[in-house]
Design a protein with these regions (language model features):
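Selective for proline/serine-rich intrinsically disordered segments
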Residues: 22-24, 67, 121
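Intrinsically disordered, low-complexity segments enriched in small/polar residues
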Residues: 28, 38, 78-81, 114
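Extended, low-complexity, intrinsically disordered C-terminal regulatory tails
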Residues: 51-83
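Extracytoplasmic cell-surface/polysaccharide-interacting catalytic and binding patches
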Residues: 1-59, 136-137
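N-terminal start-of-chain detector that recognizes signal peptides
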Residues: 42-43, 64-71, 103-107
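Catalytic cores and adjacent binding grooves of peptidoglycan-active enzymes
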Residues: 4-9, 44, 83-94, 98-137
Length: 137
């Protein structure tokens, strides 16, 4: 079971949930992102994100129209694997599409980049086998 904290950017309030790994993430429509998927390889029992990041995910997933597999979203800073200012530590970054073809990743990248809901969509030259999306502030 995980404690999931969601910062509501509209009300500036924190919402706290206690969820199982197989439960959908708060604000994710349907079952397009489960708590266990959001956690990825993190060993933390406390996870956090924002409703704005989840809304950006929803828009991307709806526009793409198919499942988007991912392996990495949340990380604690001491768990490593990312730079010191990684948005994964803030719970607002998603590395997606690792299991997809290059053409499918290109389509995800184009959808995410053209929607305008993400703060940053990493250039494909920097992430050749995945797509990095984040809703940084």
């Amino acid at each position: 079971m995980a404690k999931v904290i969601v910062y509501d950017v509209y009300t500036q309030a924190l919402q706290v949930y206690r969820l199982n790994e197989s439960d959908p993430m708060p604000y994710a429509y349907g079952r397009t992102m489960l708590v266990g998927e959001f956690r990825g390889s993190s060993g933390s029992s406390v996870l956090w994100t924002t409703n704005a990041a989840m809304e950006a995910w929803n828009a991307t997933r709806r526009t793409y129209g198919s499942p988007i597999p991912f392996r990495y979203a949340f990380k604690r800073i001491w768990e490593g694997g990312h730079g010191r200012q990684s948005q994964h530590y803030a719970g607002v970054a998603f590395d997606v599409g690792q299991a997809l073809s290059s053409a499918q990743r290109n389509r995800i990248w184009n959808v995410a980049n053209n929607l305008g809901v993400w703060s940053y969509v990493e250039p494909q030259s920097m992430t050749p086998t995945w797509v990095h999306l984040d809703k940084r502030y």
